[in-house]
Amino acid sequence: MIRVLSVFGTRPEAIKMAPLVKKLEEEQNVESLVCVTAQHRQMLDQVLEVFDIKPDFDLNIMKERQNLSDITVNALSGLYDLIGELKPDIVLVQGDTTTTFAGALAAFYHRIPVGHVEAGLRTNDRYSPFPEEINRRLTGVLSTLHFAPTKRNRENLLKENVMGKIYVTGNTVIDALRYTVKENHVFEDPILRNMDFSDGRYILLTSHRRENIGKPLENICRAVRRIVEGFEDVKVIYPVHMNPAVREIVFPMLENVERVFLIDPVNVIDMHNLMARSYLIMTDSGGIQEEAPALGKPVIVLRKETERPEAIEAGVAVLGGVEEERIFELAKKLLVDREEYEKMAKAVNPFGDGRASERIVKAILHEFGLSDPPEEFC
């Protein structure tokens, strides 16, 4: 019996780990344990409820206005003690959060193998995204098994001469969509529940990254105002992150703008179904860059660079940056040029086929001599 401890702490991690946790629970050769740090308490709990995941351990480190040092210290201390007590055969971490890095480091201190889900994403700019780029690089150094979503991610790891074994699996976020997107979905959020998505074109907007707080987010808000002023059939829905630094910018700039709907963050099922009903998505989220192509939705990436260049190369996304004029012009083009819109909407999703969790479980079993290796995602 392989004891697998899955560690995560934020909503994006939970969305991507949930289908993997469900697969691990089905495997008779695995004892699956889950620890959450609750780095993002409220939004994490939404995902756990949706996927019916009950953590075995909850470190509950969330504090108001905590800084990165607080998160790192509290997560590392709690995880070090827990891993020492449980002595798992492998610790799984996901992505690039502070919890990810702390979990990998705590496992390393106990000489326990680390499996890194979503390994090998890179922008090659240490401050963008911040602190995620360094978190995932350091996690890569500490990991024994690297579950790379794409071949490009594997190439990034090989260039860095990482130790351990690399498996190309696809991204587990595509697996999650199989659980969540339903044609007859009834929204939990009351504002969304009362919307007629057949009336006009809806743009889904999300922006919350640390590097965008300040002038970049102000530029994004100004571009949004111009978009709704220029297109009478367009409505913008913005689930605004609970971070006070984000809300202090967004609400004064957009709260009273006609056809812009500012709502609280929604649960993952509402979010995925909102994406499925949107005409266009504007986002600085990494996960949404992966999810939207699976739903046939063009994406304007509100960042200067992306660690997911596969989306740009496949033609499912375009790099919008954080300048007002460029964001507006890109949105305008997709709203006016039907041919350009269709070209992006119908491009092939480069991030997965819905079987990433299955491949990761099989890879873990293979490493412990209980299975053949999985077939690669390509």
From Swiss-Prot:
- Predominant subcellular localization, coarse grouping: cytoplasm
The reactions it catalyses are: UDP-N-acetyl-alpha-D-glucosamine = UDP-N-acetyl-alpha-D-mannosamine
GO BP term (any one): lipopolysaccharide biosynthetic process
Name the Pfam families on file.
Epimerase_2
Any GO CC annotation of this UniProt entry: cytoplasm
Record's keyword terms, sorted: Cytoplasm, Isomerase, Lipopolysaccharide biosynthesis
Q: What is its EC number?
A: 5.1.3.14
What would be an example GO MF term here?
UDP-N-acetylglucosamine 2-epimerase activity
Keyword match Metal-binding: no
In which compartments does the protein localize? Cytoplasm
- InterPro entries referenced in this protein's UniProt entry, alphabetically: UDP_GlcNAc_Epimerase_2_dom (IPR003331), WecB-like (IPR029767)
Database matches in PANTHER family? UDP-N-ACETYLGLUCOSAMINE 2-EPIMERASE
Q: Which family does it belong to?
A: Belongs to the UDP-N-acetylglucosamine 2-epimerase family.
Q: What is this protein called?
A: Putative UDP-N-acetylglucosamine 2-epimerase
Write down the species. Thermotoga maritima (strain ATCC 43589 / DSM 3109 / JCM 10099 / NBRC 100826 / MSB8)
